[in-house]
Amino acid sequence: MKPITPLAAYIKQPLLALPISLLLVACGNGSNVAGSDNSGQNPTPTIAPSQPDPAPTSAPVLSYGRLAVAEADQTNVRLLDLDSGNIAADISLQNPASALYRSPQSGYVVAIQRNQDKVEFIDSGLLASQPEAPSLHSFSIEQAKPTHFDLSSTAASLFFDGDQGAGINAGFQVLTDSSIKQAKALASHDFTQAMHGTAQLRGEFALTTFRSDVATTSLPDQVVVMHQHNDHYHEEKTITESCPGLHGSMQGIHWTVFGCEDGVLAIKQVGEEFSAIKIPNIATMVDTRIGTLKGSHKHDKFLGLTRTQQAFLVDPENNLMTEILWRDQPETTFLAYGVDHHQAHFLMLDSKGYLGVYEIEEDFKRVAYIKVLDSVPNLNSGQKFNITSSGSQAHVYISDPVNNNLLTVDLTSEAVIKQLALAFSPAHIAWVGIEKEPAAHQH
C-alpha cells in the first residue's frame, strides 16, 4: 500500500493558524439525488435490481469516510482521509471529470467524463476489513455522452445520451457497488435513438424516456415503463400523457416526476400498475419551466427549480404546484444546491454567502440559514461552487474554486467548523465511506 501523503503537500503556504488536525477531521450530503449534487446556478438535467444489493458491512473500523476533490481542468482527483486529515491518494483519471458522484452504497467514486465518452471508478479503500489506500478500479465504461446518474434506494442508473450526428444511440446501465466490484453492469438497455434522457429505477421497473416523431430537439417527450428481465429490460407500456422538452426527474414513495415545458408529469405506482397526471405550470411561472426536480425517496412532495431562480413545491397527490418564495431580495440567486446524503434536507448556497437548509418532510421549509462566506467572490467562466455531504455525520462540504478553499459546515451547530486552503482550484466533490444512519434531528 502506498504511504499516505501528508495533506500539507496539497495546501497553500503559509497554512491557516489552526493545525492540520483541526483543519480537517471528522467528516460530515444530490445526485443526484441522494448523494452529492454538484449543481451550479442554472438547473440542468442530471432501477433497482430485483434483489436489493446490501450496503457494505465488512469494515468494522469506524471511519468518517473520504472526500473526493477533483482539480479544475485537470485529471487529478484527491481523496482526503477524514479521520487522519491527510491525502489518502492522488488519482489520475484519463480525462478531467465533468462530474463526481458516490456509488449506490458509497464505496466508489463515479467519475463522469462526458465529452470523452468515458466513466471511471475510484475504490474508496474503505470496503475491506481494514482501510486501504484508494485506487483506480480497472473497470471503466465507454459509451457516448454519459450524463445523468440517478440513485434509487439500492442502485443507480447511468444514462448515456448517445450522439445523433455520429449515429450512436442512447442507453442506460444499472450499477451497484457489488456490480462495480465485479466490473460489470447489473443490467442495461439500448434505445433506437439518441436523446438527452434519464431513467428512474423503481424495483424491477425503470421509468425512462423516449423521443416521439413530433419531438424537435434532443430532449425526449414521452415516458416509457420498462420491466427488468435479468440483465436487460422489456418495454411494458408508454405513458399516454406527453411531456414535451422533458428535463429533470425525481422519485418518492409512490410518485415519480418529470419536468416538462408545460408542467410536471407525475406517475404513480401502485403494485405493478402505473398511472399519470400532468400538473400544469402556474401563472407565477413567467417565461420559464421546471428543469430540475429534487426530493427524497421517503416523501411524495418535490422541489422544482427553474433557470430564472424560481422554486416550486410539486404535490402530485393533490395535483398542485405552489411557488416557494425562498429569497428575501429579488437579486439573490443560488450558486449551488443539492440534497444531503440521507435525503433529509435540501441545501442551497446563495449569492449572499448563506447556506439555506430546507426540511424536505416539512415541504421544504427553511430550518436553518448559515453564514458560510464573508464575501462571495466573482466566478470566472466555467467556475462553480459545489456541495456534497457526509453519510456518517451531519457535515456539509462546499468547494470554493476562486479562493481555492474547502469549507466544512456542521448542521448541528449551524456553523463553519473548518476551512482548508488548497494549492489547487477545486471543482467537483463527492463523499464516500461507510454510511451511518443519522440521529433524530431537531430545529
Which residues are covered by each model-predicted region?
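Blade-level signature of beta-propeller repeat domains, shared across WD40, Kelch, NHL, RCC1
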Residues: 401-407, 411-443
